[in-house]
Amino acid sequence: MYFSWAAGSRKPRRLKAGTSGIELLQAASGEHHSLLLFSNHRVYSCGDNSWGQLGQRRDQSTERPEPIQALNDLHVDLVSCGKEHSVAVCHKGKVFAWGAGSEGQLGIGEFKEISFMPTKIKALAGIKIIQVSCGHYHSLALSEDGHVFSWGRNSEGQLGLGKNSRSQAIPQKVKSLEGIPLAQVAAGGTHSFALSLTGTSFGWGSNRSGQLALSGNKVKEQIYKPHSIGALKNLSVIYISCGYEHTAVLTEEGQVFTFGGNSSGQLQPSPRSGQRGPQLIEGIGGRVSQIECASYHTIAYVYTTGQVVSLGRGPSHTSNPTHQEAPAENSDITCLLAAEDLVDIEVKDIFAGAHANFVTTRRVSHTRSTGVSMKILPEIIRINQSLVKKWRAANKRKDREGAKREISLIFSSSACLTASFLKKRDAGENNLIDVDLKLARDVFKKLTTEKWISSLITTCLEEYLLRDLPYSSPHQEALLVFLLLPECSIMQDPKNWKTLAFEFAKAIHKMGPQSLAFLRTCWASLEVSSLNILVQMLKKAIISQIQYGVATEQYITNIKVLLEVIKEVHKANCQLPESAFIINELSGIFNFDAEAGRMFIRHNDLDCTESSDMVVFSDFLFVFDLPSKIKLMKCDSFVKLMSEVMAFPEKMSSPPYLILKVRRSHLVEDTLRQLRQVEDFDLRKQLSVGFINEIRPEAGGVSSEFFHCIFEEMTDPKYEMFIYPEKGSSMWFPVNPKFEKSSYFLFGILCGLSLHNLKVINLPFPLALYKKLLNQKPSLEDLKELSLPLGRNLQEVLNCEAGDIEELHMYFSIYWDQKDVDLIPDGISVPVNETNKRDYVSKYVDYIFNISIKTIYEEFHRGFYKVCNWDIIRQFQPEELMTAIIGNATCDWKQFENNSKYKDGYDKSHPTILLFWKAFHDLTLDEKKKFLLFLTGCDRLHVKGLQNEGIVFRCSETFSEEDNPRSLTCHRMLDLPKYSSMRRMKEALQVAINNSTGFVSQE
């Protein structure tokens, strides 16, 4: 049973469909015609047929509904009417159109003025359409896989195809909506809407009467592409309906908001004068579950009272007001159906038209139903648990074919994939990440355990989804797929790096600033597990490209894209440790010589075209481990040196080394004097040091022991260049230096030279120094490293309860390095209390690490970067820079043994060698370090040598058992006599350990 109101009628007609068991499923109305779809999926039409809109073979109008014979053999699922055209969607989503077509609104490929018979829209063949909505002269359709199509007139931008797009006689994809999981499309007179599954409303077309609810100072009259409507963002919209020049939206709470033209009172009974934008319809008497707009009126089903009400000029009015007219006088809310009209029945659906309204009903077994009649719309396909279960159990051919179709649809569509994992959004809630990534990961894991499903998903991603990723979309919901895809294990498979991971990265690389900014914001708030999955996927792709790629133009493009994308993730990272981005494999597979060449070309701009496209890995140091960073630092230094030689050819004749000749008894004095005279160019050369009367620098020098000795002297507390707050603590710069500031500049150069020459030094600074070198701010934790008692005291100040801190009698005045200092003006009279204690601690730390040493630290900083390149060093972490300079005090001594080499008749199984390693491993740690000092000139290993350094054993024929071992420190060579007993071996090792300082002449 259903009710209808035709033009001129004041009361509803109560009708039956006729044949027993046949019910009215849907009604649609144009300006002067209607379509009725019954439960047997037959379509009837009535009204004006001047433009063939009834789909009848003859052109006469009819008041009684008559079947559309051309559709009798088709299983019609839904219908829609424009002003003078009609559209029907049949089984499997085939679309037919008829009526007026001069504006292209039929979508049949031509601007045919009249089409009396339903014609199949061929452009949509093979696409399953699940929703269709007609405006006056345009049509919208939503497909099962989430695409929106539009066709017809585009005078006001109502097709959403862009400003320069004309009217279309063939359905066109609305590309601006690609990737958005949509719930509904709705067409009005000259405007259009789409509603996403998360409740976001998108509007486009005419806004001349405010029907798009745009806000702002300069509201546009037309929008040519879908625009997210901010005024509706927090309303939790679940349904949208459009009239000629007005729009109504229904919320989860059962409220109705209207906006647009109010020429016939279609918005609300008492429109607020001058107000634009969504207005709540008040006085409706309850909660609403359905709304529908006709051209100039709005109807609603108030389920809490059982009423169907109307606002505006309904079918009983025949005038044609324009939006300039004042609201109709009789614009109160009209009750079309009251609860007493619905005895033993309840409202199922409501339909509104310019000349007719319809209400369908269904029987209830009791007088008061507890259910809520909602408008149920066909939805885009998406994954759910029952589908996953069905797919995994699909063993029969027929079942598997159906499963393949469903899987292919979902995994070929960004919108469907996103829709599958949307989170439930509460009213007014605005989630940044609306998808459940953990659920996605679990579902993908279940699916990919089935080989046939895994293979099919791979094909779909490769051939469809990744090629059409919505990277240019301005809408955030479309970009959620970029968070979902890495969760699929198929994307992580190194075999798929080129077809999947790279294509994914390429889409991100193409993004505009706005889209990329949103993605970065999402990355910054991802759970650690999801962010790590993304990083590991990109790392695997980079490794695969370097391992298997040939240095072609495509190789350069691929690696540049991958590195740029992981760089964006790195910049956004707030949670993962820096080590997560390091690609440890690079040190073994990367060509550092080729990198030096690329750096040289770019630095000297030798080929502008090649230089602009070149990948220079030193721009991405965060993916390199510490040994590789140091190698790249050496590459950079070599490039700078060669570049200067190219610019000034006369420098070619200068010595290839920076040579220092020093006296052991005047080590610091001789070194600083010569460094004052060194040109910047020479600082980038390899250092060669010779001790006068001991070893010539031309013979190879002894740089390791030189650095060990000079830093041992200059950092000695007795030298008084630095202060030690406590005995055995780290050292720091003094407040009142006893040396000229130039000495700290030269000390900085020495530190830079040690790093440049890969020589580790004993530099007992806290981590704070390395933070300052990297322009990072030292903290209270760093102060604890410098002075543990002071750091603990300040921590206790922070931990003090409000009433206890005043009892400490502390003021903004401190004592540091034998000097009283006010942290603020007149700090001696400003007590520390609960309010200012954090400021006190902050200023204390800042004074020690920054303010008190500003002048001499700046000199040190300047000296260090006189040798080292800031662009390279800045990409080190403080801990890495510290390790690069002071080396590793710990060593894998077994690995040290395995790395050793043997000459002059020695091999690893020689009896003397077996004795040596047995005796060596029996040494204490301190003894081993002293032996290392004897062997290399330093008691610790440089990070570059941890994996590779060992001893080079040799034995001269002139040696006897009475001789002691000798070392060549620059080559890690040990001249070891062929001892035959453990007693003699241990005795010889003790001689070496106890004589570990001093240079040994080279033969």
Curated annotation (Swiss-Prot):
A Pfam family the protein falls into: HECT
EC number(s) recorded for this UniProt protein: 2.3.2.-
SMART domains: HECTc (SM00119)
Top-rank lineage group of the source organism: Eukaryota
Subcellular localization, as worded in the UniProt entry: Cytoplasm, Cytosol
SUPFAM superfamilies per UniProt: Hect, E3 ligase catalytic domain (SSF56204), RCC1/BLIP-II (SSF50985)
Induction comment: By type I interferons.
Domain annotation HECT: ranges: 679-1002
Broad class of enzyme this protein falls into: transferase
Comp. bias (Polar residues): 261-273
Gene Ontology molecular functions: cyclin binding; ubiquitin protein ligase activity
InterPro entries reported in the protein's UniProt record: HECT_dom, Hect_E3_ubiquitin_ligase, RCC1/BLIP-II, Reg_chr_condens, Ub-ligase/GTPase-reg
Entry keywords, A to Z: Cytoplasm, Immunity, Innate immunity, Repeat, Transferase, Ubl conjugation pathway
GO BP terms, alphabetized: hematopoietic progenitor cell differentiation; innate immune response; protein ubiquitination; response to bacterium
Any single Gene Ontology cellular-component annotation: nucleoplasm
Phenotype upon loss of function: Abolishes global ISGylation.
Keyword Transmembrane helix applies: no
Active-site residues, Swiss-Prot/TrEMBL: C970 (glycyl thioester intermediate)
Ranges for the RCC1 repeats: 40-91, 92-144, 146-197, 199-252, 253-303
Function: Major E3 ligase for ISG15 conjugation. Acts as a positive regulator of innate antiviral response in cells induced by interferon.
Protein name: E3 ISG15--protein ligase Herc6
